[in-house]
C-alpha cells in the first residue's frame, strides 16, 4: 500500500490522547520517537505488546527515545484498557500517551491501515505498524506486522541502537549487529577517507572478487 515510508516527513497531525491533545511534531521535538499503532483495545496480542512497551520504557528513555501509540479506539477506551494492561504485567506502568483516531484519517496518513482486518462495522483497523521518527521529523525505519504476529521489542531496541550509531558515526551496521560489535564503512567512503575518519583502523575482507567493499571497524 502506498503511503508514508522511510525518508518521508511524518504528518504534523493533532489528535486527542490519554495525555491530552498532542501535535506530533511538537511531541517529537529534537528526539527520536517510536510511533506505533495497534489494531484494537481489549484484544489479546495488543495487550501483551503495550505491556511490553511499558516494560521497555526505561531502555528507550536511556536512548532518548519517546513512545507514542495510536489506534481507532477513543480516549476513554484507552484509559480503561490501560488498567487491564497494567494488571496483566504488574509493575509495567503505561506512562506513554496513546492517541485516538476514531475517524481513521490519521492512520491512513501514517500508512498504518491493515487492508485485511476490519471491525464489526466494516471499518479497516490499524495494522501493527511502527515508525521510528528522527529529530528531523522524518521516518528512519518502519516495521509492519499483521494482526496475528506480535512485535519483538528486543529487535525494536536493536534497531534504535543501529540507527543512532549509524547517525552518530556515519557508518552502517551489518546483519544481526549489536552494540559493541564491529560496524561497516559505507562504500562511498574511500580508503584514504576511511583512514582519516577511523584512526582506530579498519579490516577489509579478502573476497574472491578482489573488491575491497567490505570493511569493518569499531566505534565507541
Swiss-Prot record:
This protein's GO CC annotations: cytosol; nucleus
Catalysed reaction equations from the record: a hydroperoxide + [thioredoxin]-dithiol = an alcohol + [thioredoxin]-disulfide + H2O
Alphabetical list of InterPro entries matching this protein: AhpC/TSA, Peroxiredoxin_AhpC-typ, Peroxiredoxin_C, PRX_1cys, Thioredoxin-like_sf, Thioredoxin_domain
Motif (Bipartite nuclear localization signal): 195-218
GO molecular function terms listed in the Swiss-Prot or TrEMBL record: peroxidase activity; thioredoxin-dependent peroxiredoxin activity
Listed Gene3D superfamilies: Antioxidant, Horf6, Chain A, domain2, Glutaredoxin
This protein's UniProt keywords: Antioxidant, Cytoplasm, Nucleus, Oxidoreductase, Peroxidase, Redox-active center, Stress response
Residue ranges constituting the Thioredoxin domain according to the UniProt record: 4-165
Top-level enzyme category: oxidoreductase
E.C. designation(s): 1.11.1.24
Keyword RNA-binding carried by entry: no
Induction: By abscisic acid (ABA) and oxidative stress.
The keyword NADP belongs to this UniProt entry's keyword annotation: no
CDD domains: PRX_1cys
Active-site positions on this chain: 46
Compartments, record wording: Nucleus; Cytoplasm
BP GO annotations: cell redox homeostasis
Extra remark beyond the main annotation: The active site is a conserved redox-active cysteine residue, the peroxidatic cysteine (C(P)), which makes the nucleophilic attack on the peroxide substrate. The peroxide oxidizes the C(P)-SH to cysteine sulfenic acid (C(P)-SOH), which then reacts with another cysteine residue, the resolving cysteine (C(R)), to form a disulfide bridge. The disulfide is subsequently reduced by an appropriate electron donor to complete the catalytic cycle. In this 1-Cys peroxiredoxin, no C(R) is present and C(P) instead forms a disulfide with a cysteine from another protein or with a small thiol molecule.
PANTHER family: MCG48959-RELATED (PTHR43503), PEROXIREDOXIN-6 (PTHR43503:SF4)
Protein family (similarity comment): Belongs to the peroxiredoxin family. Prx6 subfamily.
Function comment: Thiol-specific peroxidase that catalyzes the reduction of hydrogen peroxide and organic hydroperoxides to water and alcohols, respectively. Seems to contribute to the inhibition of germination during stress.
The protein's name in its UniProt record: 1-Cys peroxiredoxin A
Higher taxonomy: Eukaryota, Viridiplantae, Streptophyta, Embryophyta, Tracheophyta
Amino acid at each position: 500500500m502506498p503511503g508514508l515510508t522511510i525518508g518521508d516527513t511524518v504528518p504534523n497531525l493533532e489528535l486527542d490522547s490519554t495525555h491530552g491533545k498532542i501535535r506530533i511534531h511538537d511531541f517529537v521535538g529534537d528526539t527520536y520517537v517510536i510511533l506505533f499503532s495497534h489494531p484494537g483495545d481489549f484484544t489479546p496480542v495488543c495487550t501483551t505488546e503495550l505491556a511490553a512497551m511499558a516494560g521497555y520504557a526505561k531502555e528507550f528513555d536511556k536512548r532518548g527515545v519517546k513512545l507514542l501509540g495510536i489506534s481507532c479506539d477513543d480516549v476513554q477506551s484507552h484509559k480503561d484498557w490501560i488498567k487491564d494492561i497494567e494488571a496483566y504485567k504488574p509493575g509495567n506502568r503505561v506512562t506513554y500517551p496513546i492517541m485516538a483516531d476514531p475517524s481513521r484519517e490519521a492512520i491512513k496518513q501514517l500508512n498504518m491501515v491493515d487492508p485485511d482486518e476490519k471491525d464489526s462495522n466494516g471499518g479497516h483497523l490499524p495494522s501493527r505498524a511502527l515508525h521510528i521518527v528522527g529529530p528531523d521529523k522524518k521516518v528512519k525505519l518502519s516495521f509492519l506486522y499483521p494482526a496475528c504476529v506480535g512485535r519483538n521489542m528486543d529487535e525494536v531496541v536493536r534497531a534504535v541502537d543501529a540507527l543512532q550509531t549509524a547517525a552518530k558515526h556515519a557508518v552502517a551496521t551489518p546483519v544481526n549487529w549489536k552494540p559493541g560489535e564491529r560496524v561497516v564503512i559505507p562504500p562511498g567512503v574511500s580508503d584514504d577517507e576511511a583512514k582519516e575518519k577511523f584512526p582506530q583502523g579498519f579490516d577489509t575482507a579478502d573476497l574472491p572478487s578482489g573488491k575491497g567493499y567490505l570493511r569493518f571497524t569499531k566505534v565507541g
